[in-house]
Amino acid sequence: MTSQIRQNYSTEVEAAVNRLVNLHLRASYTYLSLGFFFDRDDVALEGVGHFFRELAEEKREGAERLLKLQNERGGRALFQDVQKPSQDEWGKTLEAMEAALALEKNLNQALLDLHALGSARTDPHLCDFLESHFLDKEVKLIKKMGNHLTNLRRVAGPQPAQTGVAQASLGEYLFERLTLKHD
């Protein structure tokens, strides 16, 4: 059934919004995995876990915001399977933050591509929506993660090879306590 409210909302944009919803849900799922990995008793970096769990919630909220847009514009939400995170064991904070940065850059590129599609289809409402709710936040988050990576590389020292879960170094512990503290 076609929507009675649909106006200036192309099927290409509608499909791209559905793909972006899926990317946000996949990011949320990955951050949830990261968050609870770092909260495990054998990892015990609660601040890192909290940081990633907050990101999981933000990405889920972003998916919901996109779904609301889809309904407001007369589009139809088509849910797709959400891909599981690429791994279950995340190692050290440095490797996890690198994976998170790559994920955010991928998500940002998808947002930029959708914005370009909206511009090409003369959809100012979509472009304004993305600019107001997503693009600036993404750039700030990418910068924040880049800063965290710089500091993690500064404090990382050579680690002896271990079996099982990599143990946090003193530098990683201090980064977690001083940078990602939460109350």
UniProtKB/Swiss-Prot annotation:
InterPro entries, A to Z: Ferritin, Ferritin-like, Ferritin-like_diiron, Ferritin-like_SF, Ferritin_CS, Ferritin_DPS_dom
SUPFAM superfamilies on file: Ferritin-like
Residues annotated for Fe cation binding in this entry: E54, E57, E58, E61, E64
UniProt GO cellular component terms: autolysosome; autophagosome; cytoplasm; cytoplasmic vesicle; ferritin complex
A biological-process GO annotation: response to lead ion
GO molecular function, one term: ferric iron binding
Tissue specificity as recorded in UniProt: In rat liver, the light chain is the major chain.
Family: Belongs to the ferritin family.
Known function: Stores iron in a soluble, non-toxic, readily available form. Important for iron homeostasis. Iron is taken up in the ferrous form and deposited as ferric hydroxides after oxidation. Also plays a role in delivery of iron to cells. Mediates iron uptake in capsule cells of the developing kidney. Delivery to lysosomes by the cargo receptor NCOA4 for autophagic degradation and release or iron.
Subunit structure: Oligomer of 24 subunits. There are two types of subunits: L (light) chain and H (heavy) chain. The major chain can be light or heavy, depending on the species and tissue type. The functional molecule forms a roughly spherical shell with a diameter of 12 nm and contains a central cavity into which the insoluble mineral iron core is deposited. Interacts with NCOA4.
Domain notes: The rat light chain has an octopeptide insertion after residue 158 compared with other light chains.
Entry protein name: Ferritin light chain 1
Organism of derivation: Rattus norvegicus
Taxonomic classification: Eukaryota, Metazoa, Chordata, Craniata, Vertebrata
